Design a protein with these regions (language model features):
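Extended, low-polarity segments enriched in aliphatic/aromatic residues
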Residues: 2-39, 45-78, 82-261
Length: 261
């Protein structure tokens, strides 16, 4: 097992064993107990490219076993170009809701809150799923290369939070309105609305599972694909932006020491 500053990477043995060890080590249960809603956000492109059911189920079982007694758990995604509920059925996610009595949410058709933020780089405002704002959001991508976002990681996975009812074109089910500029900006602005609380990346094809805080573990994920994270446009932009936000926050929160003679 390899430790990172804000996460860890473990050699893949099986989904259940690797994920249990990793999440226990990182004491994720302590964070889960703070929330009344937990959202598992898998990646679904189509019926050939998606977060595996076995991977999702292992994270789900850990969350159910370690959540506070009243907390609800949901699986949520907003597919781009396809009907999300049909994909849930085709992939097999529906079986998890029946087995564990949890909810499935289509983020393309859910209640939204309009968010404005001076740190948005392209959008003037974003209609963001309200339930994500109220929940512990865990991003669960499967690591792979991607033609639009270069790689699929915990950050780019959050493109699913753009509801298609507000971001698709008139004659298309694709979320065309997030493609008016380079994708790195749409990823950045959706993360300004809310950065996932935590992420677990299925890098089993590369021999590992990675877990920890988004941005930091995505850098490790990029390395597993033989890439320098600085070359991944959305990851470099997020690193620079959120580092700057953290510095500003610390400057505002740190007590000022006044020296008198």
């Amino acid at each position: 097992m390899i430790f990172m500053v804000k996460g860890a990477l473990i050699k893949f043995s099986s989904y259940e064993d690797s994920i249990n060890k990793l999440l226990t080590l990182l004491k994720v249960s302590n964070e889960l107990k703070k929330y009344d809603k937990i959202i598992l956000k898998p990646y679904i492109a189509d019926t050939n490219n998606y977060t595996p059911v076995e991977f999702l189920e292992s994270v789900l079982k850990f969350c159910i076993a370690n959540k506070n007694p009243v907390a609800e758990v949901f699986i949520a995604e907003g597919s781009d170009s396809s009907d999300t509920t049909d994909l849930f059925e085709s992939i097999g996610y529906n079986s998890l809701t029946e087995k564990y009595s949890i909810g499935l949410l289509d983020l393309n058709n859910t209640e939204v809150e309009e968010i404005t933020d001076s740190e948005f780089l392209k959008f003037s405002s974003i209609k963001y799923p309200k339930i994500l704002l109220e929940s512990c959001v865990i991003s669960l991508p499967v690591l792979m290369e991607h033609s639009e976002t270069e790689i699929v990681d915990s950050l780019s996975n959050m493109l699913g939070a753009y509801p298609s009812q507000h971001y698709s074109g008139f004659f298309s089910s694709n979320k065309n309105k997030i493609r008016k500029w380079p994708m790195k900006y749409s990823i950045h602005d959706i993360l300004i609305c809310k950065l996932p609380n935590f992420a677990v990346i299925d890098a089993s094809k590369q021999g590992h599972i990675i877990a920890g805080l988004p941005i930091e573990i995505d850098k490790t994920a990029a390395k597993l694909l033989g890439k320098d994270w600085r070359s991944i446009q959305h990851l470099k932009l997020a690193h620079d932006s959120f580092s700057s936000r953290l510095i500003k926050k610390q400057e505002n929160e740190d007590p000022k020491i006044k020296i008198t003679e």
